[in-house]
């Protein structure tokens, strides 16, 4: 079975706080999940990964992608096809009420994880926040041999940069529940962050290549 956990951007404090030369708008900041910037770094590379422990362990992974913000958000919003391009997902399905059911393929001996969420989008100039939170849906009851992540929550933050580049930051609740050992959390978060950002970048590149 494929390893990794995916569930499915942004931990910024105030409008004048910057990442590199990026200023985050007040509108985006107000909608973001985590305000505290004092996070611990798990990986400082092309893909940066970190976390902060509050009510939940909030994890984040970020990277600059060499394509337009329109190309990147188109892939992120294609939720029904997540299982086709995010390696650890075995199911992604959306009902008529826009509730999305996602299942994560876990390695033996661990049970799979799944969650049901709704998405929300905020656009402010050259910034996009695409967030999700857990909901209960009668269309997607809990499944046997699968741990339901009842606190699933996260967000994608996109910033349109110069030269047709997009800064992408994905933030998610790293809580795993069930039978997953606490000592394995940091390794799992690092693998998850690398997978979700690299798979996104590959899919954006593939779609742009197919169009040319």
Predicted regions and their residues:
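Sec-dependent N-terminal signal peptides
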Residues: 4-14
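Hydrophobic ligand-binding cavity/cleft-lining segments
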Residues: 20-97
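Beta-strand elements of well-folded, non-transmembrane domains
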Residues: 65-67, 104-108, 121-125, 136-138, ...
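Hydrophobic pocket/interface hotspot
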Residues: 72-73, 82, 119, 168-170, ...
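Mid-length scaffold segments of soluble, non-membrane domains
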Residues: 78-123
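Hydrophobic-ligand binding "helix-grip"
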Residues: 88, 114-163
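A short acidic/glycine-rich loop-to-helix N-cap element
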Residues: 141-148, 174-195
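Short, highly charged C-terminal tails/helix-capping segments
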Residues: 203-212
């Amino acid at each position: 079975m494929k390893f990794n956990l995916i569930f499915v951007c942004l931990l910024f404090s105030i409008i004048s706080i910057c990442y590199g030369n990026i200023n985050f708008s007040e509108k985006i900041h107000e909608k973001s999940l985590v305000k505290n910037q004092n996070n611990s770094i798990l990986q400082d590379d092309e893909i940066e990964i970190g976390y902060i422990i509050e009510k939940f362990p909030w994890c984040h992974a970020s990277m600059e992608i060499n394509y337009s913000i329109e190309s990147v958000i188109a892939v992120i919003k294609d939720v029904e096809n997540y299982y086709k391009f995010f390696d650890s997902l075995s199911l992604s399905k959306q009902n008529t009420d826009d509730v999305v059911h996602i299942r994560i393929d876990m390695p033996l001996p661990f049970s799979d994880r799944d969650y049901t969420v709704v998405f929300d989008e905020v656009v402010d100039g050259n910034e996009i926040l695409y967030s999700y939170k857990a909901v209960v849906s009668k269309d997607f009851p809990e499944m046997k041999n699968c741990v339901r992540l009842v606190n699933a929550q996260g967000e994608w933050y996109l910033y349109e940069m110069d030269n047709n580049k997009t800064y992408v930051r994905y933030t998610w609740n790293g809580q795993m529940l069930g039978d997953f050992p606490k000592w394995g959390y940091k390794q799992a978060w690092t693998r998850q962050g690398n997978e979700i950002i690299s798979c996104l970048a590959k899919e954006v590149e593939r779609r742009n290549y197919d169009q040319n």
